[in-house]
Structures are given as structure tokens and as C-alpha cells.
Amino acid sequence: MNIKDIGVIIAKKPLKENTFIITVFTKNHGLYSGVVKEFSKKSKFIYQEGNIIDFLWQARLHEHIGMAKCELIKSYTGYFITNKAKLYAFNSVISLIKELFHEREEHSKFFSFLINYLDNLSKNFCFRDYINFELALLAETGYKLDLTKCGVSHVTTDLIYVSPKSARALSYEVGKPYKDKLLMLPRFLLSDNSEITLEEKRQALALTNYFFNRYLFHNNRQVEARQTFIEYTLNNF
């Protein structure tokens, strides 16, 4: 059985000498793992996490791990390795994909979203883009937040809370009596022009973290790369 697709390498682990298992997030087939062999400097460069590749997967049966062959399309290593904010953001997003997506489950629209994010990240780290990535990931896994209007009154102004139950924004008037039980909605998620304060960064990360923990991080398990990103971001404002 053969699978041919374009993909992003999101994980690589050693199997034996010069042999590795890579996990690739493919455009049309979701996550696929395959065995690759490294016998040259060129092949080592090809099989780096974050590389966009032409991916060929071969196995006798669909349920096997299979062998993989890759041709490099684009490498992001040089853009990320010298900038901690970019590197930690990159490590976080690929670790979240590996953690939350199931093997061989198609996410073709999200694949395009990821490629666009990596292109933007290679140019400049933007915290707003990172949070929008996490929100898009929540939506892709079935837990979309509606931050466009109040979930009760339907007004589109004075939105400052998010209901942890409905995942919808709430206006100041509606949410005020219950504010101690609500999540805060950072202003920068409602306007592309607003500057982002440290407190708003905390609010944004608390917002996505709540829904990750409630629905996706089983047994309160955290993604280490995401924790590293959060610590760096909040301590280097």
C-alpha cells in the first residue's frame, strides 16, 4: 500500500543506528508515521522537525508503520533556531498537533492553516497569531469558542467575559453578576489594532488552557513544549 502526499515533519525518534521513526502531518491523510534511514548529511537535514516535505509511505498493510521516503520542499530550521520566541512557539504548535490529532485522521483545512502560520512565524513572532492558532486547534478538535457576540443578549459590544460552560463571549452587563465564575476575554482578540499587555497574555493563555484541560488534556496532562512556551512568554515581556 502506498500513500503520497505533502506534509510537515512533527516528530522524530531514534529506532536504531541511522534509523528513525518520523511522524508527518500530511495534507490529505492526517498523521502518518514511517521508518526512515539516515546515511548522509543531506538525509539528516531532510528529516528535521518542521520541514515541509514530499512524503511517500509504503507498507504491506494499512495498519503497519511502514517505510517512508521524503523529498525536502522547505526548511524552517534556520528561521527558528536562533530566536527563542519563534522556536518555543514552533515546538508548542507541533507538539499540540501530535498530542491532539489521531493517526490517519484527515485535517486538510487545518494543514493549510498550519503552513500559513509557519510562514508568518518564520518572518516574525506574533503572540496574537499564536493564540489564534490555539483557538483554531480547539475548533478543529470540536471545541470552537464563539467570541463574536454575547451568547445571551447577542450584542457585539462590551464583550469582556467567556462562559466556561458554553464557550461563548458574554457582555459586561450579562456577565457581571457571575464574574467570579467566568473567564476573561482579552481585548486583543476583538481588535487587531490593540496592543497586548502582559495581563492580556495571561488571560488569553488561561482561556485556551481551560478548554484544553477540560476537553483534551486527559488527567490534567500538560504538553511540555507548550508549558515551556508559556513560561518564556510570560517571563520575557
From Swiss-Prot:
Similarity remark: Belongs to the RecO family.
Example of a GO cellular component annotation carried by this entry: bacterial nucleoid
Protein's GO biological process: DNA recombination; double-strand break repair
Keyword field contains DNA damage: yes
Protein encoded by which gene: recO
Name of this protein: DNA repair protein RecO
Gene3D superfamilies noted in UniProt: Nucleic acid-binding proteins, Recombination protein O, C-terminal domain
UniProt xrefs under NCBIfam families: reco
Organism name: Rickettsia conorii (strain ATCC VR-613 / Malish 7)
Physiological role: Involved in DNA repair and RecF pathway recombination.
